From Swiss-Prot:
Organism, scientific name: Neosartorya fischeri (strain ATCC 1020 / DSM 3700 / CBS 544.65 / FGSC A1164 / JCM 1740 / NRRL 181 / WB 181) (Aspergillus fischerianus)
SMART domains: BetaGal_dom2
Gene: lacA
Lineage: Eukaryota, Fungi, Dikarya, Ascomycota, Pezizomycotina
Reaction(s) catalysed (UniProt annotation): Hydrolysis of terminal non-reducing beta-D-galactose residues in beta-D-galactosides
Signal sequence annotation: 1-18
Protein name: Probable beta-galactosidase A
Length: 1006
């Protein structure tokens, strides 16, 4: 493209001016909404124009992270996650609600304990985090059924359409959940500022009406009727314009879409496919919804990983810190005003809540690990970007222009996208034209500034863009009234402290940078080396040039101190808001941003507040760490770190410096091998004496499932009988006539499922599973049978969750689990009479604390023996490391004590060894919560983190395992251990354990 004409630049600048009312506060320019009509919608707190949201009258960039409370069933840990996201510079969290967990039985909505939303709202409010509520009814989310409860398989209507049967099925759930969300809205003093009806309503087939305005309007009306008054936003799966404002019935207030541009090939984490970097989002936005702020409701922050995949460490390497630099700054180049990163904390698919395409871990390669660590470099990189945006309110006033390979950079190897302001600052996003490039490219810039068009660097040398990197260069950037004419180094943050100002800049290793400040003052290097540093006055501007060094420099120009850092050093800096007390952190606003301080402190800084003459920091440490406070208020004299008064020194630049000594505690964990394991055969169904008279009969002549018609005399679809989760067991009775030689059975459990079949006590064989197979047809040869004798076929199926329902019209979620068809050679199918079971009670599930999906249909699960304190004293002593000598399923339980010192966040993991060739499957229960499904022959997961609150760090714990040997030689665990990673000295409040009801004899258990 050729250089933008003067007219084009002027047009962009004019658009950037907008028509907002503005006033000054602490050096910030606050932009208030200019349109009274949009202030008086259903509420006055959250409004918008074409550039951004306004919250409480202030223009605000929403930088958000996706978190699912149901994937961390310890409510007292939610604050920890919120504080770590707040520390990124973010101001919002988006969350799904999983319908399947709240309405396990039609008409019975239950949202208590771990499933209650109110504690999630309270934690968000305490951390100063706004919320975007996304309760569906459909969520996708890699959740079982896409969040749909299994009983929807029986709905006589097409899902996600205006079919009356489906709409009626959603009424109870949405009425309850939306009413709960409504109570948490900003209008009621809560954190919820946006509400999303439906999710990714973006594609259809099979003659379904689409897009169906009547359907979307129904979902919207459900929310509004329940009290939702905040703006409604949608999440289109691409820039398709579905339900955008102006499209008529079913339109939302604000249009948004998602994007996962790098894809999900974690097996090749270094491969960035050609052409995958978005380039048209600005044009798409102006086409689809030009009157609303540009909104990316889900932008890639990691990747899912299937059964048999490379693992989430590889996913974190795929969507890594380099990805963030290139892709997130590219999002900024389009003027993104609502940017939500999916996932920022992934969590765990505990208790069978995941879909068949994934395993127990939902780490997602996110910035926060599954165990809530912030040790991935991508977390630190994201903190640089988040705090830059937070400190740059003029970004929202700049108008994005077209990307170009000429006119700004002096090489076509680089592409520059301008965001031009009108006296409010401009931004220039630079990347490689071939975004996959790993070359280091030298360049100079031609920048339009208030001092004219300048070629940068002015003092000689060149800039460098390293491979898989991107930069945001600022022009006429306002730092509390001081004009930064330009900076090639990137801005981390800036602050005004009393009569001085601080600007923090950073660059990559070995880079050369230049800064120009519209001041006449002299330049002083007040800390660090003068080598490889030059400065010059050019008319009314001071120009400074330097080579990036690992050693910090502080340069003073007038009342402005400029911290020059390398990127790795910048990772250690934090910008906590300065709160009034320790009760809560304020929401992000111009005022709270202006009152923040800057802290250098390593692993994590959570909060800062003043009380009397003291400055109080709450922070976490994973090593001995130097601590510095930049901008301590003038009225404080004492420093407290995690409540302890700390001595400090004050240098000539007013920086407080001290240190925190780290000495890891000795963590003594029990040996799992040495526990007093008790054993129970949890497949008594194959014993000749077993009585299944109490079991539900599979006696339905028809199926209500509209997706798959019956091919059997009776339905064997598990959801027809209310069984939607975990292991299924079928028992088929027949009287032999002597001709039976084979049994064919087609079972379906979802990707990577397994099954085993017995005839009486004779093992016939197993399908050990493959990720590629959601169902499988097996043929088993029968032993010789005697005419007139009774026989029982026992079929065990490991179901892996219900399919998602992304494409409207497919009703894919209705794909049944269980036996799809069977044939007993020489006999009619009606010769077999079937019974089946899943979890005890099915939809009348027994454990209301752990929810409707947590347990399956094995004998020990039906009895509740997986819970603490089962009646195991008289059971046989046997270890899962000795295992089973033949096919079958064993149940093992043991107790152990932990004594983890308080004040330490110690991630714990149950690790399985895996060197045997025999296929086996394990379920891991911890204090009654199913926290792992291990499949030896598929993987990849062998390490299962379990959080404090599920594990009792100071007290007694119960661990239970189900071990399913699928092959004739049996199976045993190669190894099983409880391990920890680096203890973190934490300011985290005391963790309250989730409820862990003990075993009680269950009425009607069979």
């Amino acid at each position: 493209m050729k250089l933008l004409s003067v007219c084009a630049v002027a047009l962009l600048a004019a658009q950037a001016a907008g028509a907002s009312i503005k006033h000054k506060l602490n050096g910030f320019t606050i932009m208030e909404h200019s349109d009274p009509a949009k202030r008086e919608l259903l509420q006055k707190y959250v409004t918008w124009d074409e550039k951004s949201l306004f919250v409480n009258g202030e223009r605000i960039m929403i930088f958000s992270g996706e978190v699912h409370p149901f994937r961390l069933p310890v409510p007292s840990l939610w604050l920890d996650v919120f504080q770590k996201i707040k520390a990124l510079g973010f101001n919002c969290v988006s969350f799904y609600v999983d319908w399947a967990l709240l309405e396990g039985k039609p008409g019975k909505y239950r949202a208590e304990g771990n499933f209650a939303l109110e504690p999630f709202f309270d934690a968000a409010k305490q951390a100063g985090i706004y919320l975007l509520a996304r309760p569906g009814p459909y969520i996708n989310a890699e959740a079982s059924g896409g969040g749909f409860p299994g009983w929807l398989q029986r709905v006589n209507g097409t899902l996600r359409t205006s079919d009356p049967a489906y709409l009626k099925a959603t009424d109870n759930y949405i009425a309850h959940v939306a009413a709960t969300v409504a109570k948490g809205q900003i209008t009621n003093g809560g954190p919820v500022i946006l509400y999303q009806p439906e999710n990714e309503y973006s594609g259809a087939c099979c003659n379904a009406t689409f897009p169906d305005g009547d359907y979307m309007q129904y979902v919207i009306d459900q929310a509004r009727n329940a009290g939702i008054v905040v703006p409604l936003i949608n999440n289109d799966a691409w820039t398709g314009g579905h339900n955008a404002p102006g499209t008529g019935k079913g339109e939302v207030d604000i249009y948004g879409h998602d994007s996962y541009p790098l894809g999900f090939d974690c097996g090749h984490p270094s491969v960035w496919p050609k052409g995958n970097l978005p380039t048209t989002f600005r044009t798409d936005h102006l086409r689809e919804s030009p009157t609303t702020p540009y909104s990316l409701i889900e932008f890639q922050a990691g990747s899912f990983d299937p059964w048999g995949g490379p693992g989430f460490a590889a996913c974190a390497a795929l969507v890594n810190h380099e990805f963030e630099r290139v892709f997130y700054k590219n999002d900024l180049s389009f003027g993104a005003a609502i940017l939500n990163l999916y996932m920022t904390f992934g969590g765990t698919n505990w208790g069978n809540l995941g879909h068949p395409g994934g395993y127990t871990s939902y780490d997602y390669g996110s910035p926060l690990t599954e165990s809530r660590n912030v040790t991935r470099e991508k977390y630190s990189e994201l903190k640089l970007i988040g705090n830059f945006v937070k400190a740059s309110p003029s970004y929202l006033l700049a108008t994005p222009g077209n990307l170009t390979t000429s006119g700004y950079a002096d090489t076509a190897d680089l592409t520059v996208t301008p965001l031009l302001g009108n006296g409010t600052g401009s931004y220039f996003v630079v990347r490689h034209t071939d975004y996959t490039s790993q070359a280091s490219t030298p360049y100079k810039l031609s920048l339009p500034t208030s001092a004219g068009r300048l070629t940068v660097p002015q003092l000689g040398g060149t800039l460098t863009l390293n491979g898989r990197d991107s930069k945001v260069h600022v022009v006429d950037y306002n730092v509390a009234g001081t004009n930064i004419l330009y900076s090639t180094a990137e801005v981390f943050t800036w602050k005004k402290f009393g009569d001085s100002k601080v600007l923090v800049l950073y660059g990559g290793p070995g880079e050369h940078h230049e800064l120009a400040v519209s001041l006449k003052s002299d330049v002083q290097v007040v800390e660090g080396s003068n080598s490889e540093f030059t400065s010059k006055k050019v008319e009314d501007v001071v120009v400074v040039a330097w080579d990036v060094s690992a050693s910090r420099r502080i340069v003073q120009i007038g009342d402005l101190k400029i911290f020059l850092l390398d990127r790795n050093s910048a990772y250690n800096y934090w910008v906590p808001q300065l709160d009034k007390d320790d009760s809560s952190t304020g929401y992000s606003s111009e005022k709270t941003t202006a009152s923040s301080i800057i802290v250098k402190a390593g692993y994590l800084v959570r909060t800062a507040y003043t009380k009397g003459s003291g400055l109080y920091l709450t922070a976490d440490f994973n090593a001995t760490t130097p601590v510095e406070v930049i901008g301590a208020p003038s009225n404080v004299r004492n420093l407290y770190i995690n409540g302890e008064k700390t001595q400090f020194k004050t240098d000539k630049n007013g920086i407080w410096s001290t240190g925190v000594k780290y000495s890891a505690p000795k963590i003594k964990l029990p040996s799992m091998k040495d526990l007093d394991w008790k054993y129970l055969d949890t497949l008594p169904e194959v014993q000749s004496t077993y009585d299944d008279s109490a079991w539900p009969a599979a006696d339905l002549d028809t199926t209500p499932n509209t997706l798959r018609p019956l091919t059997m005399p009776k339905s064997l679809h598990s959801s027809d009988y209310g069984f939607h989760t975990g292991y299924l067991i079928y028992r088929g009775h027949f009287v032999a006539d002597g001709s039976e030689t084979t049994f064919d059975v087609r079972t379906q459990g979802g990707s990577a499922f397994g099954s085993s079949v017995w005839l009486n006590e004779a093992f016939l064989g197993s399908w050990t599973g493959l990720n590629a197979n959601a169902d499988y047809n097996s043929t088993y040869r029968l032993p010789q049978v005697e005419k007139g004798k009774n026989y029982v076929l026992t079929v065990v199926i490991d179901t892996m969750g219900l399919n998602e329902n992304w494409v409207v019209g497919t009703d894919e979620m209705k794909n049944p689990r269980g036996i799809l068809s069977y044939k007993l050679s020489g006999r009619d199918a009606s010769a077999i009479t079937w019974k089946l079971t899943g979890n005890l009670g099915g939809e009348d599930y027994q454990d209301k604390i752990r929810g409707p999906l947590n347990e399956g249909g094995l004998y020990a699960e039906r009895q509740g023996f997986h819970q603490p304190e089962p009646p195991s004293k008289k059971w046989k002593s046997a270890s899962p490391l000795d295992g089973l000598s033949k096919p079958g399923i064993g149940f093992y339980t043991a107790q152990f004590d932990l004594d983890i010192p308080s004040g330490w966040d110690v991630p714990l993991y149950f690790n399985f060894g895996n060197s045997t060739k025999s296929a086996y499957r394990v379920q891991l229960y911890v204090n009654g919560y199913q926290y792992g499904k291990f499949v030896s022959n598929i993987g990849p997961q062998t390490s299962f983190p379990v959080p404090q609150g599920i594990l009792n760090y100071q007290g007694t714990n119960w661990v239970a395992l189900t071990l399913w040997a699928l092959e004739s030689d049996g199976a045993k665990l190669d190894d099983f251990e409880l391990v920890n990673t680096t203890p973190v000295m934490t300011a985290l409040s005391k963790i309250r354990p989730s409820k862990q009801p003990n075993y009680r004899q269950r009425k009607g258990a069979y």
